[in-house]
Amino acid sequence: MDLHFENIRREYDKRSLSASDLTPTPFDLVTRWLQDAVEAKTYEPTAVIVGTATPDGHPSTRTVLLKEFLNNEFIFYSNYESRKGQQMAANPHVCLTFLWHELERQIHVEGDVRILEPELSDAYFATRPYKSRVGARISPQSRPIPGRSFIVQEFMKESLKYAGRTVPRPDTWGGFAVKPVRIEFWQGRESRLHDRFLYELRPDASWSVHRLAP
């Protein structure tokens, strides 16, 4: 069955982005836009699409939740042995996309990823709800399983094992930190004449910024 969507259109007319809104580095603007998304009560304001690729260039994406923007790095948590974890271990070049429909905004990030320090992963893991900590321990993320009953049974067994006790962070789970080298800010505008500004990291650690054609 063919599907046609050419008649689905929306005009973007809520906001603008001009050179006067920019900051010397992109990080203040990243902070401002993330805060705007939270304050506007957008749906999942910290959701971010993470793009990874194998060493020979086969890409994949998935959506995770940003948990910290710390020391100018974007931090999220996941299983090191998942598909994304394995791809990031083999090829540290990644991209991120934040999309806030309600604000008609996007941020696109390119950079290199590293595994977060264990003590920081431990500290975050301790803040997670009990069931989330148990789930992180028993899920062989991205691998085939016999059925849902398998993962439910494993969850029940691990829950009983740690009932009333501290659930330790598994060695296969922790944080990833993305250090950006390119950050683009996209603001939807009327007639598809969108505002786009690209920051790029220079060798001397300063940032260049250019307006891009929509």
From Swiss-Prot:
InterPro entries listed in its UniProt record: Pyridox_Oxase, Pyridox_Oxase_CS, Pyridox_Oxase_N, Pyridoxamine_oxidase_dimer_C, Split_barrel_FMN-bd
Name the Enzyme Commission number(s) assigned to this protein.
1.4.3.5
Top-tier EC class: oxidoreductase
Alphabetized SUPFAM superfamilies for the sequence: FMN-binding split barrel
Q: In which pathway does it act?
A: Cofactor metabolism; pyridoxal 5'-phosphate salvage; pyridoxal 5'-phosphate from pyridoxamine 5'-phosphate: step 1/1; Cofactor metabolism; pyridoxal 5'-phosphate salvage; pyridoxal 5'-phosphate from pyridoxine 5'-phosphate: step 1/1
Keywords, A to Z?
A: Flavoprotein, FMN, Oxidoreductase, Pyridoxine biosynthesis
Cofactor(s) for this UniProt protein: FMN
**Gene Ontology MF terms in the entry:** FMN binding; pyridoxamine phosphate oxidase activity
Q: What does this protein's record comment on cofactor binding?
A: Binds 1 FMN per subunit.
Annotated substrate binding sites: 9-12, 67, 124, 128, 132, 192-194
One Pfam family of this protein, by short name? Answer: PNPOx_N
What does the entry list as the binding residues for FMN?
A: 62-67, 77-78, 83-84, 106, 141-142, 186, 196
This protein's superkingdom?
Bacteria
S-S pairs: none
What is known about what this protein does? Catalyzes the oxidation of either pyridoxine 5'-phosphate (PNP) or pyridoxamine 5'-phosphate (PMP) into pyridoxal 5'-phosphate (PLP).
State the similarity comment. Belongs to the pyridoxamine 5'-phosphate oxidase family.
Assembly: Homodimer.
Q: What is this protein called?
A: Pyridoxine/pyridoxamine 5'-phosphate oxidase
Q: Which organism is it from?
A: Porphyromonas gingivalis (strain ATCC 33277 / DSM 20709 / CIP 103683 / JCM 12257 / NCTC 11834 / 2561)
